[in-house]
């Protein structure tokens, strides 16, 4: 019996060997395929110039500030080959050799001090304009010794109080050369928002006066122009604002926060509002009820895309920062990140999509500034609030290493659906009817702090077609509805080179449906 079984095993060995070889080949192919699908090369390199020395949260009882400059970056601007950096404690430092790969060769020189929580810098000739709480100040170095010797009031005329939340931002220049300033609302019982243009944005006139232009803001902490020169600003989720919006800034409009309405009673108010939108209704319904109420160009859904947007910076680097020229980068405070926004015009109004971009910064991202070489400086400060970073402040430089990430570059509205444009061609086998899922939701217009996603719906997808050599995917979406956010979730998409899609989700704010 044993001899017969042994003979049978010996006779079966070639078959077993062949089967084992086939199994090994299958496993090998599977592992290679999985490796190809999951391989995501790094496209951006980070260089830390300065950060808080402690690894602990700044709210930790044992936290102590690091030695040296507390680089709580609140504004950045280039003056020739130097980077001017203002910090929250009221100083402006000039960084010499800021593009050096050796941080020991980057020198810091104090340019100005004694400012009241400056939150923006802008070059004007060889002067610097800085927004502090009570005014926009012109800083001038008359004798070229590297220090400001003239502090000149460029503009004032808004209410200033001791409320901690009463910030002023800017100035920012639009395509027509106008200088804009935006003003925070105060918070709490001592908010003092009833006078002095709190929650407004305005321009600086030639005589230095503040000209209020638009209202309805809560915390408009970042402003930046696109390639056309149209100005955009970020606001932050809170009272009357259910999630983070990115707005097109222009005169004569209302952005939703009714705590700013008090200044309409001023004799200097530039316009009146005949109808004030009623609260506790769908956002789209509220928009149609008032002639001046306008929607965000893009909503950044709460938590999914962050919680508190900060700076707005257009990418205009001739490809030196990747294939995203013309799009906007948005700083994110709480999630310590930088997000990306694609915009398009439909019927003369801006709308578009938002995407994750860079994350895992060591502190809250507050300011963004491109360098002449196409790299991006990221300025950070927690300011006592919380962020996902484990430091309290810092400054980093981000460079593109010429390895294009495989991501959704654009999401465009179509009369019957959407078009996706990718940075690399899709692998044809990875696109199936199950690859794309679309849902939508809106928000309630309400005075309460923040808001939930309401009226959710899932949408049937059909007619998936590719073009542009696999870089474009167009598909129909059933029951498109305006003033809703459309959430796209992708599954299993990979490029022809086998790269897995880096960010599988996108959110499009559909204010208007294009006619063709």
Each language-model region and where it sits:
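Bacterial N-terminal signal peptides
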Residues: 18-30
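N-terminal secretory signal peptides that target proteins for export/translocation
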Residues: 1-16
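Short beta-strand elements
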Residues: 502-516
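Short, surface-exposed alpha-helix to beta-strand junction/turn motifs within ectodomains of secreted
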Residues: 421-463, 488-497, 504-508
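Blade-terminus and WD-like Trp-Asp/Gly-His loop motifs, strongest in beta-propeller folds
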Residues: 466-469
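Sec/Tat signal peptide C-region and signal peptidase I cleavage site
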Residues: 31-35
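Surface-exposed, short loops/turns at beta-strand junctions within beta-sandwich domains
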Residues: 479-483
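Beta-propeller domains with acidic blade repeats across secreted/periplasmic ectodomains
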Residues: 36-405, 409-417, 428
């Amino acid at each position: 019996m044993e001899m017969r079984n042994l003979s049978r095993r010996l006779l079966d060995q070639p078959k077993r060997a062949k089967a084992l070889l086939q199994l090994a080949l299958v496993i090998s192919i599977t592992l290679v395929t999985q490796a190809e699908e999951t391989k995501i090369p790094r496209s951006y390199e980070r260089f830390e110039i300065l950060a808080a020395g402690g690894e602990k949260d700044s709210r930790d009882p044992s936290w102590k500030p690091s030695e040296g400059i507390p680089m709580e970056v609140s504004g950045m601007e280039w003056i020739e080959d130097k980077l001017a950096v203002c910090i929250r404690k009221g100083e402006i430092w000039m960084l010499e050799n800021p593009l050096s790969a050796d941080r020991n060769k980057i020198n810091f020189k104090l340019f100005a001090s004694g400012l009241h929580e400056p939150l923006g810098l802008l070059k004007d000739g060889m002067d610097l304009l800085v927004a502090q709480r009570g005014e926009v100040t012109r800083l001038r170095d008359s004798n070229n010794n590297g220090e400001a010797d003239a502090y000149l009031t460029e503009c004032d005329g808004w209410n200033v109080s001791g409320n901690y939340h009463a910030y002023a931002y800017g100035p920012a220049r639009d395509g027509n050369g106008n200088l804009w300033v935006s003003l925070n609302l105060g918070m709490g019982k001592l908010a003092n928002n009833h006078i002095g243009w709190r929650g407004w944005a305005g321009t600086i006139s030639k005589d230095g006066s503040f000209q209020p232009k638009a209202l309805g803001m809560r915390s408009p902490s970042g402003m930046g122009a696109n390639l056309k020169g149209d100005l955009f600003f970020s606001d932050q989720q809170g009272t009357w604002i259910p999630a983070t919006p990115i707005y097109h800034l222009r005169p004569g409009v209302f952005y939703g926060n009714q705590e700013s309405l008090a200044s309409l009673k001023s004799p200097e108010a530039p316009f009146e509002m005949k109808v004030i939108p009623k609260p506790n209704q769908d956002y789209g319904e509220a928009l149609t009820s008032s002639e001046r109420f306008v929607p965000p160009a893009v909503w950044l859904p709460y938590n999914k895309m962050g919680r508190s947007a900060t700076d707005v910076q257009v990418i205009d680097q001739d490809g030196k920062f990747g294939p995203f020229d013309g799009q906007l980068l948005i700083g994110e405070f709480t999630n310590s990140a930088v997000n990306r926004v694609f915009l398009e015009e439909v019927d003369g109004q801006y709308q578009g999509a938002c995407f994750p971009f860079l994350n895992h910064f060591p502190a809250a991202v507050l300011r963004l500034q491109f360098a002449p070489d196409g790299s991006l400086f990221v300025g950070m400060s927690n300011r006592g609030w919380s962020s996902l970073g484990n430091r309290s402040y810092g400054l980093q430089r981000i460079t593109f290493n010429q390895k294009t990430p495989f991501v959704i570059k654009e999401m465009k509205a179509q009369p019957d659906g959407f078009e996706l444009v990718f940075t690399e061609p899709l692998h044809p086998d990875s696109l199936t009817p199950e690859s794309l899922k679309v849902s939508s939701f809106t928000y309630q217009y309400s005075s309460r702090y923040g808001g939930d996603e309401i009226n959710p719906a899932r949408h049937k997808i059909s007619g998936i077609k590719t073009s542009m050599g696999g870089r474009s995917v167009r598909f129909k979406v059933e029951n498109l509805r305006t003033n809703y956010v459309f959430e796209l979730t992708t599954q299993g998409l990979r490029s022809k080179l086998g790269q897995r899609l880096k960010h599988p989700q996108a959110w499009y704010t559909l204010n208007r449906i294009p006619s063709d």
